[in-house]
Amino acid sequence: MEPFALTRLREQRLVAVIRAPDAAAALGAARAVAAGGVRIVEITFTVPDALQVMAELRNEPGLTVGAGTVLTAAQARAALAAGARFLIAPNLSREVADEAAGAGVLFCPGAYTTTEILAARAAGAHVVKIYPVGVAGGPAYIRIIRDPLPDIPMLAAGGTTLENVVPFLEAGCVGVGLGASLADPALAAAGRFDELTRRARAFVERLEAADLRAAGA
């Protein structure tokens, strides 16, 4: 059986990457994007008191909460104890992979080249985060690397925008991680949560329109 968060990712396709200067801003940002329809949220360990944020969000209806920038086994264990349903990292750590496997949660390490992608998959990655995908070449890069690796689920991150979110999915990504283009830390710090909700709705509506086109509506 696949991890719960992977099923949710296949359904929802969007992950809000929450970075903020303090826990209150992170909580507000997570709730704001969820109100706009983006209901998978990654609380990065760069957020002060990130574990507190995860713990406060873990039981909110319809929200799937996970940890980002998970660099060590200790961070992985702490995130899992706080209720994280997935672990995402910019790199591959076999210790973090082992913690995810032991808990049965989604593990999504970062990779850039085909060699790194295959190493991540061999270590137990359910999904591989292609990062930073904007520098690598965007959707065109995804199409190229999926030719030899069509069976490895990929998450685009680092350089994703409203304009390229659908092209990334059309190129074969199972999902897209959205950082500043959605949950801008400056907006969160300023308390402009209505703008974050508006951005989330725009991303969701962009996907809905693409789905209708694909269905021939």
Predicted segments, located by residue:
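Glycine-rich beta-to-alpha transition loops that act as phosphate-gripper elements at the mouths
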Residues: 19-22, 47, 67-73, 89-93, ...
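Conserved functional loop/turn residues at catalytic and ligand-binding sites
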Residues: 37, 61, 83, 91, ...
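Glycine/Thr-rich beta-alpha phosphate-binding loop at enzyme active sites
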Residues: 39-43, 80-82, 102-103, 113-142, ...
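Glycine-rich phosphate-binding active-site loops on the catalytic face of alpha/beta enzymes
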Residues: 86, 90-99, 129-138, 172-194
